[in-house]
Amino acid sequence: MMAEEQKVLTVNIVTPDGVVYDHHASMLVVPAMAGQLGIMANHEPIITPLEIGEIRVKRTDNPGHEDAIAITGGFMEVSHNIASIVADGAERARDINLSRAQRAKQRAEDAIKTASEKHDSDELRRAQIALQRAMNRIDVKNHLQ
């Protein structure tokens, strides 16, 4: 006998520093490599890599509210109504320090300029990723406001 289909998805986000997020959701949107991917309860099992971007979670305990989380890449596994996200880094929008993110953006822009002048392709790539991460944090924080 089959149990009634659930309409709740558990979303867990973990980084090397520990659990960043753990809530029930009606829907989850993640920045997959192939584009934005929406996940709801009873989704087929899937494992997918994630890019630097914003995760959006529509929570079941507050239907009008959507949580935003900035991630710096990782992967997601969905199985049995649990979405487990393992990310290199993740920060909830409410926890992002905007001035710190803006300083990181400025440092990355300066590093891009220096690396370009030195023709240092490795340093340039690292600086471009740092800029992408800083811009993502700024965008996610601004999305909250």
Swiss-Prot record:
Topology versus the membrane: Peripheral membrane protein
Membrane-spanning ranges: none
Amino acid composition bias (Basic and acidic residues), ranges on this chain: 106-123
Entry keyword Chaperone: no
Molecular function GO labels: ATP binding; proton-transporting ATP synthase activity, rotational mechanism
Domain of life: Bacteria
Self-association state and partner proteins as the record states: F-type ATPases have 2 components, CF(1) - the catalytic core - and CF(0) - the membrane proton channel. CF(1) has five subunits: alpha(3), beta(3), gamma(1), delta(1), epsilon(1). CF(0) has three main subunits: a, b and c.
Family classification: Belongs to the ATPase epsilon chain family.
Protein name in UniProt: ATP synthase epsilon chain
Species, as recorded: Latilactobacillus sakei subsp. sakei (strain 23K)
